[in-house]
């Protein structure tokens, strides 16, 4: 058997293993946020409840053969499952082609699996699980002590400097509302693993996220204005009822803010943000939540902010939630495979100029 044939067979093997792991990651993405076991409960159709046969669970191929439908009831199966399986397979194959069977390849397999899981959960639930960020950080800390290959070798001070710079940048972004705490934890953990290569990852993630965010903002602008106006009118009517009822809401010249969220199509008010002294006269605080929930039906995930000044609602602002974890994950994965080449290319470009 020639070397080329062995290489091809090995690539096919790595691809199939990656797709099988991707199938398991689909289970992790769906069940862990719901606190369900990822082992005990067998795979089944969400529509009819029938347990899937073993020949219906071949990664990628079963979805294609079944044409994205359940064998028993014909209900549609989201193509996302196949996409995740293919994504894991391709990422594992890419890691093998870059690093071969090495320590770097082993680290890449763990890292890419974690990145796929956190991306899926972030898309579904707008949060990056703490354990995902911790896993990435553990890989980085292990790099301090384990003599891995040259691609993972970096002085300890380089990793710490990268960590410090990234932490400061992301703390600022979190404080101004540009990113969430999960994004900060992820990039801090990744900086321990990547060292100076975290900066290409950061650049790629921010650029992709910005392009996605701007595109989505332009596309959804009209719908967001309509939703904001609905919330404003409901809040005005509710607040006027409180004033007419003389329930004792007195700001005494102070400002107050009502913060609400829309999660899974269900609007709610985060009352812990309110001034308790100002609002203690209202016997039923949940009346505003009920009013918004009864009159607004939307699948949009977002947050709204109602500003009250001198007994008047002066501003209502709605902003749609945007996931950022998947874009950071793309940046981290790309930088893990090609970060050194990207940095060297950029340095060479600067020298030429």
Predicted regions and their residues:
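A membrane-topology feature that recognizes alpha-helical transmembrane segments
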Residues: 1-353
């Amino acid at each position: 058997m020639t070397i080329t044939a062995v290489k091809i067979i090995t690539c096919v093997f790595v691809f199939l293993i990656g797709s099988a792991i991707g199938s398991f990651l689909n289970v992790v993405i769906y069940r862990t946020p719901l606190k369900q076991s990822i082992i005990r409960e067998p795979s089944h159709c969400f529509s009819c409840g029938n347990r899937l046969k073993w020949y219906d669970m071949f990664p990628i191929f079963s979805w294609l053969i079944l044409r994205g439908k359940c064998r028993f009831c014909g209900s549609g199966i989201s193509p996302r499952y196949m996409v995740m399986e293919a994504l894991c397979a391709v990422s594992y194959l890419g890691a093998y082609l870059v690093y071969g069977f090495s320590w770097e390849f082993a680290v890449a397999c763990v890292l890419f699996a974690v990145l796929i899981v956190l991306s899926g959960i972030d898309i579904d639930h707008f949060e990056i699980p703490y354990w995902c960020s911790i896993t990435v950080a553990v890989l980085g800390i292990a790099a301090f002590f384990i003599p891995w290959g040259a691609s993972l070798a970096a002085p300890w001070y380089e990793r710490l400097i990268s960590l410090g710079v990234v932490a400061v940048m992301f703390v600022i972004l979190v404080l101004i509302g540009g990113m969430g705490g999960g994004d900060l934890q992820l990039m801090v953990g990744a900086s321990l693993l990547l060292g100076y290569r975290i900066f290409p990852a950061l650049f790629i993630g921010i650029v992709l996220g910005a392009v996605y965010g701007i595109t989505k903002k332009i596309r959804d602008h009209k719908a967001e204005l309509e939703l904001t106006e609905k919330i404003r009118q409901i809040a005005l009517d509710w607040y006027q009822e409180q004033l007419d009822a003389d329930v004792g809401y007195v700001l005494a010249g102070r400002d107050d803010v009502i913060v609400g969220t829309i999660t899974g199509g269900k609007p709610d008010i985060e009352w812990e943000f309110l001034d308790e002294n100002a609002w203690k006269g209202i016997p039923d605080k949940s009346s505003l939540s009920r009013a918004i929930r009864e009159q607004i039906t939307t699948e949009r995930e977002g947050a709204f902010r109602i500003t009250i000044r001198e007994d008047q609602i002066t501003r209502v602002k709605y902003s749609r939630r945007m996931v950022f974890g998947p874009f950071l994950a793309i940046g981290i994965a790309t930088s893990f495979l090609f970060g050194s080449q990207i940095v060297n290319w950029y340095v060479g470009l600067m020298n030429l100029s």
